[in-house]
Regions:
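Thiamine diphosphate
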Residues: 1-130
C-alpha cells in the first residue's frame, strides 16, 4: 500500500504545485522517490507529531495543501488538540493520512494500534473522514 500511495502522491504533486508532504519520520522503503522528486515540498518533521500538524495548518493558512503522513495513532490521537484547534476550527485544507488506520499495526505493540481513529476524527467539527 505504501508504494502505491507514494506513486499517487507523485502523480498529484506533478499537477499541483501548492501541495506539500509532511511526514513524522516515516517513509523508508516507500517515500524516497517523493522526497527526491519534490525536495523542498517534502518535510520530515521527525518525531514531533503536534508540531507536524501545526506546521501543516500554518502552511494551509498560507495557501498550501499539506498532506500529513504517519502511522495512524501518530497522525490522529497524538496531535488531536492541534488537529481540532489549528486545522478544524479554521477549516483548513490539511489532509491527514494514517498508515494502518482502523486496525492493529502488527507486532509494533499497543502504541501503534489505533482502533478508535475513525470515531475520534468523525466527532471533530468540519472534519471529513474517507
Amino acid at each position: 500500500m505504501r508504494v502505491e500511495f507514494a506513486q499517487s502522491i507523485i502523480d498529484s504533486f506533478d499537477k499541483k504545485p501548492n501541495l506539500v508532504f509532511i511526514t513524522g519520520d516515516l517513509g523508508y522503503m516507500a517515500l524516497e522517490k517523493v522526497q527526491q522528486k519534490f525536495g523542498e515540498r517534502f518535510i520530515n518533521a521527525g518525531v514531533a507529531e503536534q508540531n507536524m500538524v501545526t506546521v501543516a495548518a500554518a502552511m494551509a493558512y498560507e495557501g498550501f495543501t499539506p498532506f500529513v503522513y504517519s502511522i495512524s495513532p501518530f497522525v490522529t490521537l497524538r496531535p488531536y488538540e492541534q488537529i481540532r484547534n489549528d486545522v478544524c476550527l479554521h477549516n483548513l485544507p490539511v489532509k491527514l493520512v494514517g498508515n494502518g488506520g482502523g486496525y492493529g499495526y502488527g507486532i509494533l505493540g499497543a502504541t501503534h494500534h489505533n482502533l478508535e481513529d475513525i470515531g475520534a476524527m468523525r466527532i471533530l467539527p468540519k472534519m471529513k473522514v474517507y
